């Protein structure tokens, strides 16, 4: 997939499926995870963060088997070498692998776990889910190397933060809506502007 420099377009692009995650401002991971969480009924917050992917667990499920029909990303179950989709009530000879993973990211303010879905995960890992599955099946050592190579890389992320209720407890869920390779010249300019604002 083609990468986008400097996070171009991230500030105004809408979230996946036109979810309405609109204009976003630069922020930090700590600011997106306040100690006092908003209620679950509050709208999601959207922000732009430059952070490094500092931990991807190679032993975690990083993708799932999805229905091969275009536009249907529902999970399928393997049965006797075939794949059954409950959504379509059909059995298929093949399936598609789609990413769904959690990774830890860190910026200057702190760290947080984010959920990353197919398109963004493919960008960040640098390999398609089908290819990663084939590597995992044939060469577990290479699979671990591929995952490790994706760590400690900087990304300009458009994040959505939403409070969720789970078993009576509130927690903050961070989701990567978009990702791009940072433009370090633009980042340096932004930092300079912040320093000047402090001393103005």
Residue ranges of predicted features:
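Single-stranded nucleic acid-binding proteins centered on OB/S1-type folds
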Residues: 1-200
């Amino acid at each position: 997939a083609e990468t986008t420099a400097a996070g171009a377009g991230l500030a105004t692009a809408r979230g996946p499926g036109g979810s309405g995650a609109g204009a976003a401002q630069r922020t930090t991971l700590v600011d997106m995870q306040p100690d006092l969480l908003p209620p679950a009924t509050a709208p999601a917050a959207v922000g732009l963060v430059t952070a490094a992917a500092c931990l991807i667990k190679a032993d975690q499920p990083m993708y799932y088997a999805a229905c091969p029909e275009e536009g249907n990303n529902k999970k399928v179950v393997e049965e006797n070498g075939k794949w059954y989709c409950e959504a379509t009530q059909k059995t298929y000879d093949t399936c598609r692998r789609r990413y769904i993973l959690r990774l830890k990211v860190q910026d200057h303010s702190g760290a947080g776990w984010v959920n990353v879905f197919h398109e963004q995960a493919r960008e960040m890992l640098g390999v398609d889910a089908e290819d990663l599955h084939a590597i995992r099946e044939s060469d577990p050592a290479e699979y671990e190397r591929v995952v490790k190579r994706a760590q400690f890389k900087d990304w300009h992320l458009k994040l959505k933060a939403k409070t969720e209720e789970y078993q009576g407890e509130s927690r903050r869920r961070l989701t990567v809506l978009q990702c791009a390779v940072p433009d370090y010249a633009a980042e340096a300019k932004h930092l300079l502007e912040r320093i000047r604002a402090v001393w103005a």
